[in-house]
């Protein structure tokens, strides 16, 4: 006989899984105008956090990536670290919508605490480079692309709905169903799924380790 999860068991669900479910729900309900508003908000918030510092972050929607009806799948957000003194780009990384939403929640949550405590000046001191710190967070988010089923294996494949899976889980699932196991969207043909792009090469990594922000996420070159 099957058993139902008790309320106590539900409360013991891994925090990581609960956070993932919330992010998936958030991305599902997000409208295009709200998305653009969040991009603008991050530019404003990070500018305030980095006030008085030599570097700042700039968030932009990659041109053309949001032009289709399936913009949530295709859209890419470019995060660039810029030196205010000479305008030089020091690092540039690219995120998908899911990764951007995670970063948005992280930054706005910390900013709310800083601003409400009236310690914005301390938070933007010369001792802590906000731009480099948040570029490091972008690296963490884009490096930890995980399987939506087991939340452990590295994602090898992504579906049109933007949910990603490791090869082991997707092999088990595809033999039983043609729907995404997370959102249940139907996948009608094999060519509707895509193999994840390879991780940065050794040469790429060597170029980025010179600076914390230079190791942030997937390399992006305009």
UniProtKB/Swiss-Prot annotation:
Pfam families reported for this sequence: zf-C3HC4_3
Top-rank taxon, per record: Eukaryota
Keyword Zinc-finger appears in the UniProt entry: yes
One function term, GO molecular function aspect: zinc ion binding
Zinc finger (RING-type): 147-184
SMART domains listed in its UniProt record: RING
GO biological process, one term: protein autoubiquitination
Nucleotide-binding is among the record's keywords: no
PROSITE patterns, per the entry: ZF_RING_1, ZF_RING_2
Disulfide bonds: none
Key words of the record: Metal-binding, Zinc, Zinc-finger
Matching PANTHER family: RING FINGER PROTEIN 141, RING FINGER PROTEIN 141-RELATED
Protein name, as recorded: RING finger protein 141
């Amino acid at each position: 006989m099957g058993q139902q999860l008790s309320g106590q068991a539900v409360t013991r669900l891994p925090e990581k899984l609960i956070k993932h479910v919330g992010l998936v729900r958030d991305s599902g309900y997000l409208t295009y105008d709200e998305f653009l508003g969040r991009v603008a908000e991050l530019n404003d918030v990070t500018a305030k956090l980095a006030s008085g510092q030599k570097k700042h972050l700039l968030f932009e929607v990659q041109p053309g990536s949001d032009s289709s009806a399936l913009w949530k799948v295709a859209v890419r957000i470019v995060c660039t670290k810029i030196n205010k003194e000479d305008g030089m780009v020091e690092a540039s990384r690219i995120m998908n919508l899911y990764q951007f939403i995670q970063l948005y929640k992280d930054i706005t949550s910390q900013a709310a605490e800083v601003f409400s405590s009236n310690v914005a000046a301390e938070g933007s001191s010369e001792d802590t480079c906000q731009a480099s710190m948040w570029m490091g967070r972008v690296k963490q988010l884009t490096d930890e692309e995980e399987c939506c089923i087991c939340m452990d294996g590295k994602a090898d494949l992504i579906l049109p709905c933007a949910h990603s899976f490791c090869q082991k889980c997707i092999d088990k699932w595809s033999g039983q169903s043609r729907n995404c196991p997370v959102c249940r969207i139907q996948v009608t043909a094999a060519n509707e799924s895509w193999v994840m792009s390879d991780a940065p090469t050794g040469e790429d990594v060597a170029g980025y380790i010179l600076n914390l922000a230079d190791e942030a996420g997937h390399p992006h070159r305009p």
